[in-house]
Amino acid sequence: MATVLEQSVPAELNPDPMLPMPYRIQRVRQETDDTFTLELIPTDSHDGFSFAPGQFNMLYVFGVGEVPISISSDPADAPRIQHTTRVVGTVTKAMRLLQRGDLLGIRGPFGTHWPVEEAIGHDVVIVAGGIGLAPLRPALYRLMAQREKYRKIVLLYGTRTPEDILYRRELEQWRGKFDLEIQVTVDRAASTWRGYVGVVTTLITRAPFDPSNTVAIVCGPEEMMRFTVMELQKRGVAAQRTYLSMERNMKCGIGLCGHCQYGPVLACKDGPVFTYDRLAPLLGRAEV
């Protein structure tokens, strides 16, 4: 049987994957000072697409440029989709100025996916750092939609400050509605903060899961993922059941330009989701 690394979910691409399809902005929601979510619907010219948790799109701001962004919405809501984006460059700055009713071009969905089916019958540990919660959010939706198929589900989430926490209201709803363990930590906080303080890896040692029967999925800054994997391995989580999302300088989305190549893999085509045993020799290596 093919694994998540050997095949991508067949994406409902338009006949020309290099041609952006028009989407209309339905809603703009400010998440934090530098992060926002766009909710988009397909225009009347096409029907949109379905996607698997962990896949990404290339978002095109007409007249400005294109940037790869993971899909952050519930797969069950497709073709309505959401993208949560941090303002970090020219394209995302222009994207932040878009308003309800404006058009955005989308190519995709591209890439491999989180192992939500492979994790059935296991404990699932989800470790997110900062904006890394956004690519993991579709997996959380899918896990909760079929909660009875999994054992423990644990979300460990780290941000810089309490003000940087994404989807704060949603996290509280999930904690109360589902059998879901959620632990949040921040790097620094005022004395009024009642949660954990410290890097997210400090949560792993006390998190309630069975390492011998756990699937772990991790997304965040590369350095954070490296240390997270180290702590998971100390607990006994197998490298082949530890999944990371690597999104490095993707341009075409279909493996043609080679811009996202590092080592023998292309992040846009072979990833962005990889098992750690495959990715371990490449972590920290610059693109070729």
Region annotations inferred by a language model:
Residues 6-102, 160-161:
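Ferredoxin-reductase
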Residues 263-288:
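Non-heme iron-sulfur electron-transfer modules
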Residues 223, 247-272:
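Local cysteine-cluster metal-coordination motifs and their immediate loop/turn environment
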Residues 63-66, 107-113, 286:
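Short, charged beta-turn/beta-strand-edge "cap" motif at the junction between a beta-strand
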Residues 3, 90-251:
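FNR/FR-type flavoprotein reductase catalytic core
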